């Protein structure tokens, strides 16, 4: 029988649902639901909108009385419901227009290693775990310095209108191009000049991003036997789950999920016991350098092993811990009704001289929150691993848009863990050592001088707060992660266990942070491998083979290049705490948002090329906002005369001290530290310029191509010809009644995918 073509599409309508066939001789490959919105649904969505509007009113305008954290959770939840049901649906209908009779890259190129059609629940778990890393946890905690109101608005509204849109549409254009990487799509759609800039610049950006994420993991796990044991156990558990689904019980996702959750909980609980044994403390109390090498080895393995064996099941497994803990925190907010201690808008929002980070609300609030609302890193996953696992185009909305929406909710909860803390303790945790000298007495004096509302803090209060979580000190525990753990412990002990379990929850939170962030390191490494392969393949000759992921020598070689790049920077940061990656951390937010600018540029151009100029505002408005934020931030970082903001000004000040033979200057306490600052500010400033040049080249090329397209003279659309699908799978995480009925008819396990017979 001749292979069917997409033009053979047949729809058989039955009631409010239609069965879609790629060919009359094949079983259905999709169910299209066309049920009109009922009165009950209308009442529900109107009620959600009204409740959400009321919650936002309380959050935004109540100034003379304390605001309960529950209002922010309600406002966020209602906004997400309306956004997903209506705005995401608008994008699906007007821009994406999914065709489930078209085969996805996973179905067309199924090789059992990189391209593997995977159950949408596992894909959602992998995708969410891969995109949600340090950004949505740490960024909102640091941004609390500016107040809870601007942060909460940007996290929620920014995600619905920008972050979720970017993720959904990058996934869409990558799926339509056989899962190509972001850099390769820039070259294909915008031309060679922009393509070269992107294929060179994006790998540099992603290297820094992965190294920063890995450093947070190392810091969390160093000398933490509980965390090391529990996270190490997720690897054999994931391999077991992968083999179980692949060989023992194919399609039984719910079954293996229950087994995996049970084993994961056992690993978490037993980790506390192991940490208190002599052998456990000896085996799993690892130095930062040892953890670096183990993390590098794991990243390489996750990049080259079949995606079904380690990466996908481990990310899916981690999602249960991530979502479960965030849900527990949300329940804690609703049960404990904590009062927000942070001001709606702090004085640091305007002055720009806050102790946590320097800079005014615009643009640095948006840079600091980073992945919580809009994440360029997500675009790498949406054009990396996820499109190579997707079963059907109809699943893109729940995975792309819904995945980022879930990440945004994580950021909301992270914001609340910091906002409910006594603000004197918040700034005690986050004030630099330069101001506190790591002393409770000095910290109390410094924090009390910030002009915060509420009762002044005492050294005894600070010491008691540290003792309550089993720590020697909480003074100047900068970086955001310790504050998040302290806030999580503060919230969870009110709901489960009381004061006696506060220390347990604190150390659980440290382990949770490492588990949460590690999934972005492994998926990011694999996505970067695809990008390196695409970039080198453009040189032609024998390197052309690198663009074929099935060529294993190329996959191994590119993976080695990627882990060597971020691993070397990670080792530098660990062995030289004052230099290397620590000084690159301020670049993380800007680099991430500049990457989003590249992704949104490509999306906007593709929408125009497809003849949907009328809807180009959907990605176009977020693009303009992102460029305004990131280019302003980059300008200030490069040219500001304030040494706390401008890299080159700080470089000049420390270089002058170096030339004068100073042995101490600013935050540097000796000559070696002065040399470190001089070197690292030079690297920071140089990379800032490089990143801006790359983005400007891509945006200018995008504008030129878009204008030529409108005039009928643009570069042709680089979309691959569709291939007919022979695979059926439900579109949503929960199958509809019609989908379940068809599944039973086809004899598949509940909710699983089914391949049509040849």
From Swiss-Prot:
InterPro entries in UniProt: CstA, CstA_N
Keywords carried by this UniProt record: Cell membrane, Membrane, Peptide transport, Protein transport, Transmembrane, Transmembrane helix, Transport
Subcellular location per the Swiss-Prot or TrEMBL entry: Cell membrane
One Gene Ontology cellular component: plasma membrane
Main location: membrane
Cystine pairings recorded for this chain: none
A GO BP annotation: cellular response to starvation
Family, per entry: Belongs to the peptide transporter carbon starvation (CstA) (TC 2.A.114) family.
Protein name: Peptide transporter CstA
Residue ranges crossing the lipid bilayer per the database entry: 42-62, 67-87, 122-142, 153-173, 198-218, 225-245, 256-276, 291-311, 320-340, 361-381, 401-421, 498-518, 561-581, 588-608, 615-635, 687-707
Pfam families in alphabetical order: CstA
Task performed by this protein: Involved in peptide utilization.
Mode of membrane association: Multi-pass membrane protein
Domain of life (superkingdom): Bacteria
